[in-house]
Amino acid sequence: MVIASSIGADLAMAFLTQTKLSVEHAFFDGGQFAQIGKGTRRIITPFLYFAIRSLYWSKGGTLKKILWCDDDSIKPYFIAAGKNLTYTDLRRQISDSLEDKPFPSLPEELQRNIYFEFGSIKDHFKYRQAVMEAYPYGNYPVFEGYDHMQYQIHNPKGFAEMLAHIAERDCMPELPFIRK
């Protein structure tokens, strides 16, 4: 099973489209399907760099201003990211991520075993329709009342159990917050 969230989904999609390895299931958090023009990506890079670095400088104090939460369980990861981030690395990542271009094609059989989760309250929900058009055989659960990556951060055990259910039974479990 391939699991991808946020910008890391670019790597997972490259893996799915460029490898000969068999993948039975994939799960994507829909936030990574934002499509932003090249000029806009160039403009936002220095601001994003400053925002991420500020997480290190403020010991996580700016997290709530940048992201939807300031959960103590994720602060150490963002602080470390802010400490280790270089402008060059971010520029390279942004230059080949979030591109405003067609999604790569995937075989129908693989699409049937891919889950593209979108939280209902995140800005990236607006990209759901484009993903549905690109992959018409995929599965598109909506996590009602959730933001980008919020379920996996607040309930990692429940998230892991959900992924195990998908791998074992080829379907989403019945969860009270899932809208189809």
Where are these regions (language model features)?
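Conserved serine/cysteine hydrolase catalytic core
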Residues: 92-133, 142, 151-152
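Structural beta-sheet core signal
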Residues: 2, 28, 114-118
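Catalytic histidine-centered segment of alpha/beta-hydrolase-like enzymes
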Residues: 146-159
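Short, hydrophobic alpha-helix immediately C-terminal to the catalytic nucleophile
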Residues: 12-17, 160
